[in-house]
Each structure stands twice: as C-alpha cells, then as structure tokens.
Amino acid sequence: MNGGKECDGGDKEGGLAAIQVPVGWQRRVDHNGVLYISPSGSLLSCLDQVKTYLLTDGTCKCGLECPLILPKVFNFDPGAAVKQRTAEDVKADDDVTKLCIHKRKIIAVATLHQSMEAPHPSLVLTSPGGGTNATPVVPSRAATPRSVRNKSHEGITNSVMPECKNPFKLMTGSSNAMGRLYMQDLPGSQQQELHPVYPRQRLGSSEHGQKSPFRGSHGGLPSPASSGSQIYGDGSISPRTDPLGSPDVFTRNNPGFHGAPNSSPIHLNRTPLSPPSVMLHGSPVQSSCAMAGRTNIPLSPTLTTKSPVMKKPMCNFSTNMEIPRAMFHHKPPQGPPPPPPPSCALQKKPLTSEKDPLGILDPIPSKPVNQNPIIINPTSFHSNVHSQVPVMNVSMPPAVVPLPSNLPLPTVKPGHMNHGSHVQRIQHSASTSLSPSPVTSPVHMMGTGIGRIEASPQRSRSSSTSSDHGNFMMPPVGPQATCSGIKVPPRSPRSTIGSPRPSMPSSPSTKSDGHHQYKDIPNPLIAGMSNVLNTPSSAAFPTAPAGNGSVKSQPGLLGMPLNQILNQHNAASFPASSLLSAAAKAQLANQNKLAGNNSSSSNNSGAVASSGNTEGHSTLNTMFPPTANMLLPTGEGQSGRAALRDKLMSQQKDSLRKRKQPPTTVLSLLRQSQMDSSAAPKPGPDLLRKHGQGSFPISSMSQLLQSMSCQSSHLSSNSTPGCGGSNTALPCSANQLHFPDPNMNSTVLQNSLTQSIPLRGEAVHCHNANTNFVHSNSPVPNHHLAGLINQIQASGNCGMLSQSGMALGNSLHPNPPQSRISTSSTPVIPNSIVSSYNQTSSEAGGSSLPSSIAIAGSNHPAITKTTSVLQDGVIVTTAAGNPLQSQLPIGSDFPFVGQEHALHFPSNSTANNHLPHPLNPSLLSSLPISLPVNQQHLLNQNLLNILQPSAGEGDISSINNSLNNHQLTHLQSLLNSNQMFPPNQQPQQHLLQGHQNLQAFQGQPTVPCPANNNPMACLFQNFQVRMQGDAALLNKRISTQPGLTTLPENPNLALPHFQDTPCELQPRIDLGQPMKDGLVMGGQGDASVDAIYKAVVDAASKGMQVVITTAVNSTTQISPIPALSAMSAFTASIGDPLNLSSAVSAVIHGRNMGGVDHDGRLRNARGARLPKNIDHGKNSSEGDGFECFKSASCHTSRKQWDGEQSPRGERNRWKYEEFLDHPGHIHSSPCHERPNNVSTLPFLAGEQHPILLPPRNCQGDKILEENFRYNNYKRTMMSFKERLESTVERCTHINGNRPRQSRGFGELLGTAKQDLVLEGQSPGSSNSLESSLVKDYIHYNGDFNAKTINGCVPSPSDAKSISSEDDLRNPDSPSSHELIHYRPRTFNVGDLVWGQIKGLTSWPGKFIREDDVHNSCQQSPEEGKVEPEKLKTLTEGLEAYSRVRKRSRKSGKLNNHLEAAIHEAMSELDKMSGTVHQIPQGDRQMRPPKPKRRKISR
C-alpha cells in the first residue's frame, strides 16, 4: 500500500496548503474536475469513488500512506494547489511502478496485448453490425462507463486499479474522458455525463491513453467502439477498426473496454443508460454495443466472436471479470472481490466489478451482437443481457488483456467467473448468473461493485438490472436468468467469440471445474486454460465467429492466451514477465489449438464450436446459454449453442482434466472421433446443439448447479452441461416442474441457460436442465449440451443434446449437462440426437447429433423426446409428438436409428397415440439397430434410457441412444440423416407391418406400457409430466404401445401380438421378432427399470449425476431419491423397485405392466441385439444373433449369449432378436467398426434387452438372466468392463427377479457402458471388472434383484468411484481392478453401484453374481422370480433377493469383499431409500467378512 515512500504516498504535508499526490498516483484536472489515476490506471473522480476504490479488494493502493487521510491525500478541488513533484517523487513513482504488481500487470498486459495486436483488425472487421447496434448503446455506455468507472474507482479502484487499469486505464488511457467520467462524481450525473462524457472520454481517451499502455487514442474504447464507437459516439466503425487495427487501440480498447465496456457493462448492469436498456431490449447489436463498449469488438456478435477484437475483449478478461462483477454487482456478494484483491487480477476484478464487469458485459454485448437476433429475439431482456454479458466476457478478455483489469480478471477468474461463476451462476443463478463461484470474489467484486453500483447510478445494478438485464439479473428467475445469462454470457460470449471463449473456458460449465481450476490452479489454469480454454477458445472462436475468419487469430490473439495469462497472473500475481510468458504460451497454445480446432471444426460456426470447442467451448457454451438461448433462433444462436455445447464439453473436460481423468481424453477422443466421423453433420447439429445449449438454461439455480455439477463432474452433458436446443426445455425437465415448457423455453430456458451455463449441460450442460426441451424446439434443434454433458456433460450439458434432445449435458450435459436432457422437436433427434447429443456433450456426440438433428428436422416435431436430467440428476426422457412416418424412408436405411427415434417416439407416441404405432415398430426395429450405434452413447443415453423408460420404448431408445452415441460417431451421420428417420421409415415398412399388429396390440400394450414406462415414467414422470403433462402418461402408455406394446404385455399376450408384429417387424428389421421376443422375455416391469437403470448408468458413465426419482408411477421412491445420485436415485427407485415394479404392475395392471416392461426390455434387447448383430453384421439364428451381439460386445459374450440363450427360454426371444439382428447386421459395420466399444455396446444393447426381457417371465427371465449373467460373465471376461448393462440389469433388477433378466439387459447396457467407460471413464474404472467379479456382481445383483440395488445406477462418476472403490476393495485381486472397473462400469442385474454419484458416497457397489442373477431366476423361479406384483417393496425385493441369492449363489461365487460390498451397498441403499432391505441375517452374516475385504480394498 505504501508503494512509495510513506511521505510520498501521502505527504502529511499535502494538507490544505499543497496537495501531495501519492507516489505512483496521478492527479489530473480538467473541465470535468479532478481525476486521480491510481497506479493501476483506475480513474477516481470523487472522494466517494476513492473510498469505494480503497475499500475494494484487489484495487491498487500502492503509494498511499499508511494512515490514509482521504481529504488530505485526495483533494478533488480543481483549484487546490498541488505540491510540485520533485525528482525524488518521480523516482518514487518509478519505484512504485516497479513494485506495484498492478502496474506491472497492466504493463505486461499492455505489452502482451500489443504483441497480439495483429489479429485485432480482423476482429474489428468482424463486428460491422455491432457498431450499429452499439450506437444506441454508445451514449449510455459512455455514460455508464464513466459512472461505472467512478463507482469502479470508488469501490474497485484498489482492486480494480490493476484491473481498473482497464477501466480506469480506459478512462485514463483509453478514455481519459472515462476518467473524467469517473471524475463526474455523481453517479447520476456521471451516468448522464457518461453519455456525453464517454464519447469525450473516448475522444479524450487519447490524452489519457498515454497514461496506460492501452492508451491507443480511443483504441481501447474503439475496440468497443467498433461496436462501441457508435456506442460511444467515439469514432465510428472506423475507430473500431482503427483501434482494432492498431495494437494501441486494442490495448486501449481493452482499457476502453474496461472503460467503455465498463460503462457498457455498467450500462448493462445499470439502467443509467437508456441505450443499455435499449441495448438489452433494443437490439442485440445494441446490447452488443454495450458489451462492445466493454469490448469494442463485442459490438458485433460476429466481430466479437470472430474477430481478434472479439478476442481482445476476450482477452479483456478484466472485462470478463467485470461482467462477472457486473453480474456480481447484481450480487452484493461482490464483497468478496476484495478478497480477490490479493491478486492483481482480483484488483482488476473488483475494478471490473466496480467497473461493472461490464467490461465483461461489454464483451457480452459483443456476444449479444453475435446473438443480436437472440438479444433482440429475447424480449427477455436478460437474454440480451446474457448475450451481452457473455459477449462482454468474451470480448472482455481481449479488453482485459490490455488492461491490468485483465489480470485481475483471472483472479476474479474471469474464466472462473464464467467458470466458477458458472458454478456459482448455477448456484446464484437467481442472484446473478454471473456471480461466479470463483467470482465469489468477482461476485464480491461485484458486491463491491454493487455497492459501488448501488452507490452510484453509474454502475447501478438496478440500472444494469433494469436496463441491461440487471432487472432480470436482479430477479433470480427471469432476471436471474438474465443475470445468469450475463454470467453465462461471458461464458457464452467466449463461446460465441472464439477468442473470448478461451477466457470463457471458465464458462459456467467449464467454470465449475475450470473455475475451480482457475481458482485452484491459476497457473495451471492458464496453462490448462490455454489448453482447455484455448481449446475452447479456439473452439469458441470457430464457434463464436459466424464468420470465423479471424477466429484463429483470436485464440492466438491473446483473447484466450491473454486471458489465461491474466488468470495466471491474477491468480498468482505473476510478475509481468511471468504473465507475458504465460500469455505468450497461452496464445501459442491457443493459436495452435485454434488452428487445429478451426480446421477441425471447419469454419462452421456451429460445427466449429462443436468440434473446435468440443473441449473448450463446453464452458463457453454454458456461458453462452443465455445468449445462445436468445440467439437460439438466430444464426449466432447457433454459435452460442455450439459454444454452449462445446462449453459444456469444455467444462466437462476441464473438470475431467482437473481430475486428470482419462474420461476427458476419452471424451475428447470420442468427440473428436464423432467430429471426424460426422464432420459434416456435426456443424449443423453442433450449431443446433449450441443453440440448444444456449437455450439450455437451467431455470432453477439448483438445476443449474446440478446441471453444472453434472456436466462438470460428469463430462456430460451440456448437458449439461450440458444444454442443447432443448436446453430451453431443459429447465422444463428440471425446471419443468417449475415452469411451463413453453415459458421455460424463453424465460426459464434463458434463466436456466444463464444459470446453468451449463451445461448443466454443462452441460450441460449439461444435466443440462436445458435438455428438457421446450417442445417447440427451435432451441431444441440447437442442441443443448452436451453435452456434453454430457450431458451433460449436460448434458448437458451440456449442449449435450444436439437436437437439444440430449442436453445432458448435459451431458451431461451434463449437461447436464447436462442435467435435463430433452429432445424436443426432432423425432429423429430424440433418440439419435439425444444419444448423439449426449455423446456430443459428453463425448463427441456432436457429429451424431447433427445428423440426428438434421433428420429430426423434418419430423423432429413428430418426436418430442424429452430427456430430462432432473436436478437430482435423473434424466427423464419423454417422447411426445408424431410418428416419424415421413422419416421412415430414412429409417429403412438405418432402421435402428429410426427405431431409436421410434422408441423415443413411443414416448411421443404417448402424447400422440397415432405416433406410438409407427414409433413402436420403429422403436423396436430401430432400437435394436440403434443400440449398436448408440452403444457407446449407452452411458450417455442411459440417461435417456432412464427417461425413455417413461416412454416404455424409451428404454431401448435410451439404450439405443447410448449405444448409438458411440457408434453414432461412425453411424451418426447416416444414422442421423437416415437412421433416425429410417427407424420410423423402416419400422413403418416393417415395424408398421408388425406395428399394425402392434397397434392392434397397442391398446393392450398401452397398459403394459406403463409397466415399461412406469418405472421410468414414475421416475421421470414428475418431471416429464410437468414437462409434457399427459404426454408423459401417454408416453408411458404409448411407450408400451409402440414397439414395447406388444412385447410389454404378458410374454404370451405381448408376444402373440408382437410376434405378429415381430414377424412384420422382422421384415422391417429382422430384429423385429427377436426383439419382440426378447422384449417379451425381457420382462414387463423390468424394461422400465432397466431403462431407468440404463439411463442412470449412462448418466453415471457420463459422469452425470443421475438421480432417479420415481415420480408418477413410482412416486414414493421419487421423493427420497431425487437428491440422491443416480445411483441413490436409482436405489430409491429400486428401493421402490418393488415400488417401481408395483407401480409398473399397477400401471400395467399386473401382468400388463410386466408386459410393458417386457416390451420395453424386449425392445431394448432387440435394440441391443439388433445393434449387436448389426454391429457384427452377422445374421444369426437366435443363438447366432446372440452371438453376433456378443461378438459386438465380445466374442466370448457372443457365444455365451448363444449358449445361454439356447439354455434359456430366452433362446426363442433371442430368435426374434436374431431376426432383428439380421437387419442389424446391415448396420453392423458401423457398430462393428468399434469392435470393442461399439461392439460391446451393441452386445450390451442386446444384453440389455435380454435382461429387460427376462424379468418378464421369471423362468424365462431366469433363462435370460442366466444367459445374460453368463454372457455378462463371459463378457466380463471379454473385458466388457464398462458393464453398464450390469447397471441396467440392476435397474431391471429393481423390479425384482426381473433384475436378473435385467441383468441381461444390464449386460447389454454394461457393454455400452463399458465402451463408454473405456473411452470416457477409463481412469477410475478401467476395464478391470473380471468375469468373476462381474459374475459375482451379477450374481449378487441377480439374487439381490429384488433389492433393486440395480436401481441405483451410478453416475459415470459413480461408476468411476465404484471402480475405484472396487479396485480398492479388491486391491489384492489382480482382477480386482478389472472387476472393479467392470463393476462400476457395467453393473450386472442385481448390481447396485454407488459409484461417485454426485453427492453420494461411492458404494463399494452391490454385485449380483451372475449365478445369483442367473440362478435366482433360473434356479428358483418361485423365489428368484420376483413379479412386479410380488416386489411390492424394496424390503420384499431384498428378501426375495437374499433368498434367491442364498440358493443360487455358490458360496465361492461372490468374492467375500464383493459380498460385503453388496451388503454395504444394500444397506446404503436402504438408508437412502429409507427402507430397510431386510436381508436375511444369514445373508448379512455371510457378507460380513466381505466388508472387511472391501474395507481393505477401499
């Protein structure tokens, strides 16, 4: 604080006689009054500002004397005499400059910025439109910046000083006028003056510009000026170009951004400027402008996004930071900004906060510009604000870079602001989307800023709130969304703006992890940020820039690198040299990555964002959501969505990277593979995804948080994460309960989006609440997350659902990221896209999704697949809409995809009765085929599966999606373009044939459908029901009706009709019959559970938090479980497995329910087997088909399946499947391409169905289960470590003995999961589940099927956790690792895996031995056979399980530790479900020794 000599700092002499200017400080007198310039460049125009500045953490207070007497040191009387500065004073000033980190940072940033100046021109070029929009904002911006600056100075000066440098510098250098602005003491007058003054400032900027490295005449502002020049009235487009053109300008631009952007942000944040409100309300461009003010380039979304300018703003992390601040301004919590003060970044942060992260906001306007349409589109002001904020964020980074503000931003964690902010955003979405967790400081900066803002209208939050989206920001819901949007926007902007994206890496989704990363590892963050963020940035650049010409340069530009440098600097207070070196490195990395991403992503904005930003943009996407949401309709929205999805992915990646988990790599690979496999399709879907992601807001903070967490923790989706086109709807899922679907789309979605930035994606989002698609689906097409998550992670989100169907983002995407995944308008997309989306959000689903989306395009309305990841992480997929009949033609090409959709459709069919018929057949046909395709996505899609169960067919669809996701990477383009619809088409051809029968049967299946749907429906019904209302019920019914219908009924009843149908189905897809049979075998009630379980497992695999809440039908379970992780939720579900079964039974009316489940299972089995067969391209008789399936999973499994099939009654069922397999064979090659993963997944799919089917008939189930168990066992041996099918099986198991049958299903799922795991979850759970462990696991689960331990599906994290736990458990056992991995990855029938489900302690994992599963059903049908009616309670189920287990389990079968783990898991399950699984004491006693082992393992 005493930067110079104490006497220098505040010469006591400098009393009334002569004012002594503190060392390192400058005092300027002009017509506006006295202006004090802090060493960091903050401009303080009044005592209040000085106080605020000094009280703001992170502001530069160097050179001030210790006992600081403000009136003595700071004299704002223009006539006061100033003590002449002596040479000594000058030297002291120099010393202060050397000693002052803030100053050094500013200089370093300026230097860095200048070094990166070149790209700026292109950036400037990018936002021609921005200028216009900005123009209206200019005045307000000018005014606001000044006010903001004043405020900033007051509150943020200290903290901002460094960062303030940006704003102040802007004021000083970029806009001395701004300083003057600040000088205008009155906030109101300042603001008013700001209007006139800002331009002056800008004009005067040259004068002050000298002060800071950024002094480029109004370059700083001009940068915003390009979009801000009009805004500021400073120059015009030319200034913008000019500033952009010249490094100085850009440098100044940054300051300008800080200043102008600040004002803009302020403006954004405060209503003071009418333009801001205009901007917000007025036009996207305007909003852009406001943001642009922050970042000149942000002015135009494209510019911001695409041009270096944008990048610059991005660099202006300070701005970014400011945005968070601004957002945080909304949030009084900004108090924390002071904490950030330690780092310059923090200082800047406060400044930004003080300045109103408008600097960030400015970039957001840039973003808004990018998303002009959306901004405009969104009457929802917040949307605009969001856009602005994101833009600001994006733009900000560049601005920040030049200014010290940049440095603080990092501290603020501009990235984290986005990042943590995202998290916090999610957390505080209500407060301020931007209140980043990381920005806690930023928020607190903002708080300070708020104080400041509140203190002075200049950055008055209210004004911002009222004007920008401050109002929205203020209001937690809509405003919050706005706020969130703003927060998100920073992310989004980054996403939007390739360059900002880098800073955005800390976008909400990424932010969660990234935020932490930033927070935790500023340096690494910078490095990582430069990698991850840069990647995102590059991705973002590609994505953000609609005309991504300069995107490439942007990343290098320092937008990202600088951001990272700033982050690094801020976080670590690195010396300028360190900062510069970091920035240079980041820039290089960014450029390299960007180049790669650009080429990779192809310029397609959406595609780029999707592919390029796969890693980085996830975060961006999340950030982008609000904007994207708004933009959704617009092309920019595309970028936003893509960015959102990418952001979710990035966020997931960040979190993964943070964890250093292979999954990230796997996801990246997957994503890449998907991108590669469907490079062309990807753009569209990605764009859609991005849109979806953008719209993938999570309405509620909790949702957002969940989405974020889902996506961040579970790569997936966007959703979410994750965060797809359905993102808007995502809230529907999660927020669905809270908001109407449609509303959700616009407001809730935006809110959610902002909040979830996710991806909840996230990613997704991610978990991507956003996935819950608005049924209208303009956003839906824009995919959420995803996710990616995926997805949301997720996700979505997410982002996860390219169609927005898979917002898991997201993902998981997310998504979550999921989180809420909802595919809404695209029938095709629902399954393929959802799966695809999931993949994108969590893996690389983008490519698949794109096709899906494309396909969905024609009939997507037909299928409204709502895959929602509930807050608890449950992913509910509901399909509502019309059959994809028109799509059927494509279906013929890729029946399984179409069928997938059909499956989804069934849900939709539920909504539309006529839909179900086409859907059902399609589903049945497509599911089998789709499974192989989606198997990789199985994990992702498992979420869908969870949701799909609601649709009855959803199970298969989910599985298909999951399976499809992986294979979709290969098949997605075909699948999406052809298969998605093909399912319908082919199904219609064949399935319809069968379907006619089916339809005839449909009426009956309708009741059964609930059985299938019931568990699922129950789990997701609440969400879905809210989202789709009676559609959900219809889904259940239709689910049953569609493909499932015939099978779902009693094996006899269902089979007869279905057999008829199957025959016809077979023609459509040979698999039809087998599938039918399999479904029948699969078990009526189990299908739903299996679907849920699968979905949960998928979500878990994705790393999404999956909480299955049995809602509608299994209402009882839903209550306790929602908070639980997927596993716990599933456990609850399982806890109510009986409940589920019961519900299913009730819904199905006894056997009917079973039939439905059976149908679903059969479908699943079909889908799985068909895919497997397709994968293998082997047509085989029943055994053969199985073999094919197995070969898909693994050869051994194949044989096992065959052998098992033969032994079991399953054989017949499988026969039908084999028929399906034949058609599947056709599709086999795509799946086959991925022998390990895809093949496994296809196998898994096949298995899943068997598992699902077995529950149908106890004995048959037993046979099936045995087969499955055997297959699983062998498969395990075959190294199907990710035995999600096991999880699915467990899910199936939830329904009593069926679980055993489910085991088969679970195996199918497991295979897919395994594949996914292999790709995405290798780290914790490597392919280590051995056959023995798996067998034990399965066996145990089989015995324990009633317990519905299966019900608990671990999230990917759960799986990882389990795997790790399992590994720990069996550390001594060589196969322990394998087994463990396998266990978590692929849970067998009875296997309840409490992996690291979010919020749940990882269970060792309950294992059902294959023997148990097999024997329980096979040996003692009476005992093992648990009918839905029988399994009325978890306790009952547990008891039945224990009985079966005792009988069927061979003492040696289960490892002791396995037994113990199972026992423990059961206990935990009971605890969680609140039910006591009454396991016979004998069982428990038997298990005790194992616990020791497990403990040891642990």
From Swiss-Prot:
GO molecular function, one term: chromatin binding
Sequence ranges assigned to domain MBD in this UniProt record: 11-81
Keywords: Chromosome, Nucleus, Ubl conjugation pathway
Domain PWWP: 1385-1409
GO biological process: glucose homeostasis; positive regulation of growth hormone receptor signaling pathway; regulation of multicellular organism growth
InterPro entries xrefs: Methyl_CpG_DNA-bd
Annotated spans, Required for interaction with ASXL1/2/3: 57-68
Region described as Disordered: spans on this chain: 199-274, 329-350, 452-521, 594-642, 1350-1377, 1473-1498
UniProt feature, compositional bias: Polar residues: 614-624
Pro residues biased stretches: 333-343
Domain of life: Eukaryota
UniProt feature, compositional bias: Low complexity: 499-511, 594-613
Gene Ontology cellular component terms for the protein in this record: chromosome; midbody; nucleoplasm
Basic residues: compositionally biased ranges: 1487-1498
Further comment found in the protein's record: Named 'methyl-CpG-binding domain protein' for homology to other methyl-CpG-binding domain proteins and the presence of an MBD domain, MBD5 and MBD6 may have evolutionarily lost the ability to bind methylated DNA and are recruited to heterochromatin by alternative signals.
Annotated PANTHER family: METHYL-CPG BINDING PROTEIN, DROSOPHILA, METHYL-CPG-BINDING DOMAIN PROTEIN 5
Oligomeric form and interacting partners: Core component of the polycomb repressive deubiquitinase (PR-DUB) complex, at least composed of BAP1, one of ASXL1, ASXL2 or (probably) ASXL3, and one of MBD5 or MBD6. Distinct combinations of ASXL and MBD proteins may preferentially bind specific histone modification marks. The PR-DUB core associates with a number of accessory proteins, including FOXK1, FOXK2, KDM1B, HCFC1 and OGT; KDM1B specifically associates with ASXL2 PR-DUB complexes.
Domain writeup: The MBD may lack methyl-binding activity.
Role played: Non-catalytic component of the polycomb repressive deubiquitinase (PR-DUB) complex, a complex that specifically mediates deubiquitination of histone H2A monoubiquitinated at 'Lys-120' (H2AK119ub1). Important for stability of PR-DUB components and stimulating its ubiquitinase activity. As part of the PR-DUB complex, associates with chromatin enriched in histone marks H3K4me1, H3K4me3, and H3K27Ac, but not in H3K27me3. The PR-DUB complex is an epigenetic regulator of gene expression, including genes involved in cell growth and survivability.
Name assigned to this protein: Methyl-CpG-binding domain protein 5
